[in-house]
Amino acid sequence: MTILKWALIFLLVSIVAGVLGFTGISAASADIARFLFYVFVVIFLVLLILGLTIFRA
C-alpha cells in the first residue's frame, strides 16, 4: 500500500506544481507517480496470479 500512497502523493505534487506554473517539477512528479503506479499494478497482478494458482492449496 505504501507504493500506491507515494504514487498518489507525487500525483498531487504534480497537479499543484502544474497549477502554480512549475512545469519542470510537474513533469518530473508526474513521471514518478506514473512509474510507481505501474510498479504497484505489476506487483498486484503477480500476487493475484500467485494467489489463484500456487497458494490456493
From Swiss-Prot:
<keyword id="KW-0812">Transmembrane</keyword>
<feature type="transmembrane region" description="Helical">
    <location>
        <begin position="6"/>
        <end position="26"/>
    </location>
</feature>
<dbReference type="GO" id="GO:0005886">
    <property type="term" value="C:plasma membrane"/>
</dbReference>
<dbReference type="InterPro" id="IPR009760">
    <property type="entry name" value="DUF1328"/>
</dbReference>
<keyword id="KW-0472">Membrane</keyword>
<protein>
    <recommendedName>
        <fullName>UPF0391 membrane protein bsl5717</fullName>
    </recommendedName>
</protein>
<keyword id="KW-1133">Transmembrane helix</keyword>
<dbReference type="Pfam" id="PF07043">
    <property type="entry name" value="DUF1328"/>
</dbReference>
<feature type="transmembrane region" description="Helical">
    <location>
        <begin position="35"/>
        <end position="55"/>
    </location>
</feature>
<keyword id="KW-1003">Cell membrane</keyword>
<comment type="similarity">
    <text>Belongs to the UPF0391 family.</text>
</comment>
